[in-house]
Design a protein with these regions (language model features):
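Carbohydrate transferase catalytic cores enriched for Leloir-type hexosyltransferases
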Residues: 1-397
Length: 397
């Protein structure tokens, strides 16, 4: 068996998002656990990859250049047919299988056995193919469906939850459901507490903080809902006579929130200014992976109000960090985290604020939930994910 894998999402704008993290971790786990199998890893030439630190230790990995770096955009198909497909045809063997961890850059399901990982149907459900402009949205919509429709030619579809599987089959009811395999993702956060002085105010230990980590700036992430709920939480404290100058911070972690050219980021900043929250809301900017555990573990609660998710890696990390989790009552969170988290209507800031307040003033009440969450998080490993993935490879071989 020979496995060809597209690893470009470890190098492009998705490298530190869920898509890129999945690609990195599933490749490393597959290499580690299948030493006798030859893997060809497709990568851009002269471009840093999140795989660079670890992949050199695996002798069963052949790194294959596919040309200079190209951003993931509307020109994907031109790049695929002129740069990538010729390389695939050159290196494929009779026993080759192609594994595509993401669909946007196209994949050779029409010429060889292919397995595609579907992370979610978010873009289709929210008609959110591009946030650049309505024209860009239409262009990307056409590209999206051209790429996604090709998935019906794949031998198998992998998905990160039963929710994603169900959503995929709603759009493609003709695809055999038994050939859509659910493989929950892994949680890799290192349980090590390190100083947060470079990211947080000096008084964060005294004032405490609510953390929003692993979010995004598209509409379905509902980042504005987090800030609105936090504002209502402050109002609850004020009603109960608390000094707001000593109120817990809202910490928003992630480099994407620094891109002030994005209308979605501008909306957040404007709301913060309009409601005089500048001294209460802290943006960490980009943070190294090694700080994720400490950012989570030292918070009094983690909040994620995304209206739709495929899985929720950062939520799993929060469970591992033993922090109460407050989540929007979305299908996937009900599927995976209903017994380990507080589920709320993320579009109702008053309801969400009451949940935040209760966790803040009654921490003892949530100790059992925290322990259940930690135990649950241990179920999610990349070794398990890779094992199920490789079994699908074997079915196709």
């Amino acid at each position: 068996m020979h496995i060809i894998i597209d690893a470009t999402t470890t190098q492009d704008q998705f490298a530190f998002a869920g898509v890129g993290q999945y690609t990195k971790n599933i490749i490393l786990a597959l290499l580690k656990n299948n030493a006798t199998i030859q893997f060809s890893i497709l990568r851009f030439k002269n471009k840093i990859s999140t795989l660079d630190k670890d992949i050199s230790k695996y002798k069963n990995a052949q790194l294959v250049d596919i040309g200079e770096y190209k951003i993931n955009d509307y020109k994907n198909n031109i790049w695929y047919f002129t740069q990538v497909l010729p390389v695939i045809k050159k290196i494929r063997r009779k026993d080759s299988i192609f594994f595509s961890p993401y669909f946007w850059r196209n994949y050779p399901a029409d010429i060889m056995p292919t397995i595609l990982f579907v992370h979610d149907m978010n873009l289709a459900l929210f008609n959110m193919y591009s946030q650049q402009s309505p024209i860009h949205n239409q262009i990307r919509k056409v590209q999206y469906w051209n790429a996604m429709n090709k998935s019906t030619k794949c031998k198998y579809i992998l998905s990160n939850s039963q929710t994603t599987k169900n959503d995929y089959l709603k759009y493609y009811p003709q695809y055999p459901s038994e050939q859509v395999e659910v493989t929950y993702l892994g949680i890799t956060v290192e349980e090590r507490n390190i100083s947060l002085d470079k990211y947080l105010p000096s008084d964060y230990k005294e004032r405490q903080y609510l953390i929003y980590l692993g979010g995004g700036i598209n509409r379905s992430k509902n980042s504005i809902g987090v800030i609105k709920a936090y504002k209502e939480f402050l109002n609850l404290r004020k009603q109960n006579g608390a000094d707001l100058t000593k109120a817990p911070y809202l910490v928003i972690a992630g480099g994407q929130f620094q891109n002030t050219e994005k209308p979605e980021v501008q909306e957040l900043i404007e709301y913060i200014k309009e409601n005089n929250l500048q001294k209460h809301v802290i943006f960490t900017g980009f943070y190294e992976d090694k700080y994720a555990y400490s950012l989570l573990h030292n918070s009094f609660a983690y909040i994620h109000l995304a209206l739709y998710e495929g899985f929720g890696i950062s939520t799993g990390e929060a469970l591992r960090a033993k922090v109460p989790t407050i989540l929007h009552k979305s299908p996937v969170y009900e599927e995976i985290f209903s017994e380990t988290s507080l589920l709320v209507d993320g579009l109702n800031e008053q309801e969400t604020a009451k949940a935040i307040y209760d966790v803040y003033v009654n921490p003892e009440k949530y100790k059992n939930m925290i322990e259940r969450g930690y135990t649950k998080s241990l179920d999610f490993t990349w070794d398990k994910c890779a094992e199920k993935t490789f079994k699908v490879f074997q079915k196709v071989a």
